[in-house]
Curated annotation (Swiss-Prot):
This is tRNA dimethylallyltransferase 2. Residues 41-44, 161-165 are annotated as: Interaction with substrate tRNA. One of its GO terms (molecular function) is tRNA dimethylallyltransferase activity. ATP binds at residues 16-23. It catalyses: adenosine(37) in tRNA + dimethylallyl diphosphate = N(6)-dimethylallyladenosine(37) in tRNA + diphosphate. Belongs to the IPP transferase family. Its cofactor is Mg(2+). Substrate binds at residues 18-23. GO terms for biological process: tRNA modification. Its EC number is 2.5.1.75. The gene is miaA2. Monomer. Signal peptide: none annotated.
Length: 313
């Protein structure tokens, strides 16, 4: 398939829950469309975290990818940094006449790319924070409500540090109002992969077995031996948290598999909930059946959203 001239979209997005086959579909479409893949995965940015994050780099072949293996484990990375690097990658790819394909399942990253609003990385203002030492919690809450009049019973008001951080962000955003660069003219076409629940559960379980057999435990051990503390590995998600517990003799091998498998199933449900919320917030997702030939269905969606085809239609 070869789409030419002026498609209605200039960003193709492939999303879906874990183990749904996103990477394979994105790679196949990138080959056909002359595209490059931008990862929307919060953990694949880190080097040497390959098996636990499901990078599947062998599937990419000659297809160029972005935002994978760009940081050392332990370095900070945020949704704000993702949005900045995502926009840089889009500009680079489009500037070379190629099509960017966003692929991943991290909901916050997908939102940051698709909902077309600029995000600010808000630094801590230590001098301003010091000035609040004598300010009572009630006064802090009152100041926050001045920035956010509709705020009622928010979790931001439960803890003093959360209130201070929320107020810090609100002040920063107010100071930056009107200073934003315009968001690029992105016209995304979003394709989601959907599976029957029982089949997705089977795929998740089988993939976990394969990862454990392929050296995931050894990968986590090497990361810890290389200086990444257990607390940081816990932060990097389910696979690293549960394998770390196993390596610290807090779980048996059988419990590792059973508990991690159950946790990943629950995670997939949360991803699906996030995707439904994206739809309610105005993101149009074209769903294809993972078990019914997703590549052919995706081709049809793409052709339906293209002005001109190489066949001359």
């Amino acid at each position: 398939m070869n789409v030419s001239n002026a498609p209605r979209f200039n960003l193709l997005t492939i999303l879906g829950p874990t183990a749904s086959g996103k990477t394979r579909l994105a790679v196949n479409l990138a080959r056909e469309l002359g595209g490059e893949i931008i990862s929307a995965d919060s953990r694949q940015v880190f080097r040497r975290m390959d098996i636990g994050t499901g990078k599947d780099l062998h599937e990419y072949g000659e297809v160029h990818h972005h935002l994978i293996d760009i940081l050392e484990p332990g370095e900070e990375f945020s949704v704000f940094a993702f949005q900045r690097l995502f926009l840089e990658a889009v500009g680079d790819i489009c500037g070379r006449g190629r099509l960017p394909l966003l692929c991943g399942g991290t909901g916050m990253y997908l939102d940051a790319a698709l909902r077309r609003y600029r995000m600010h990385e808000v630094p801590e203002d230590r001098e301003w924070r010091a000035s609040l030492e004598g300010v009572g919690d009630g006064e802090l809450a009152s100041r926050l409500r001045e920035f956010r009049p509709g705020l009622h019973n928010s979790t931001d008001l439960v803890d003093r540090q959360r209130t201070i951080r929320a107020l810090e962000i609100a002040r920063f955003q107010a100071d930056c109002a009107g200073d934003d660069e315009p968001f690029p003219d992105l016209r995304p076409l979003v394709i989601g992969i959907r599976w029957e629940r029982a089949e997705l559960r089977r795929r998740i379980t089988e993939r976990l077995r394969q990862r454990l057999e392929s050296g995931m435990i050894e990968e986590v051990r090497r990361l810890n031996d290389g200086g990444v503390p257990w607390e940081r590995l816990d932060y990097y998600g389910l696979e690293y948290r549960f394998v770390g517990m196993y390596l610290r003799d807090e779980l048996s091998r059988n419990d590792l598999f059973q508990k991690l498998n159950s946790a990943i199933h629950d995670f997939a449900k949360r991803q699906e909930t996030w995707f439904r919320r994206m739809e309610r917030n105005g993101v149009a997702i074209n769903w294809v059946d993972g078990g019914g030939g997703p590549l052919s269905e995706a081709r049809r969606v793409i052709l339906d959203n293209s002005y001109h085809l190489a066949t001359g239609r």
